[in-house]
């Protein structure tokens, strides 16, 4: 992420987002980069400090690779045009540093502004801290977030790892329509 802070790249990114109706999506390590840059949750490249959200090591202290169920918590983004609040998706995750953490004030702001995009949920479709469903222990079961204007989205789940013959033995809706 540090090379994206170079003035030429940072200016080009901000021009894309602010003047050319651009969108950015970061999945897994891409989400980590967007958070470290400040593009999510702030919508701009900025210096980060202890008052800012971040992604860190999974609570279990090791890599997790499996399918989880997520729930759409907000559709305040162009990325979610084909989704509805409450939609459930079964998606693969594969990470060792995917736990979203945030100070109380930052978390409250994300929730109040509708920037919590998706959350890990249990079998009843409810956000949970249970490690059986929330694979990294993310606060408020957060799997993905938006920038304030929704143009930038970051998420841990690998929605791109799907196909006609992928995960056929795993129940659930694997189609998360972000690219439509």
Could you say what each language-model-derived stretch is?
Residues 72-180:
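C-terminal and late-domain segments of enzyme folds
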Residues 1-78:
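Cysteine-nucleophile active-site neighborhood
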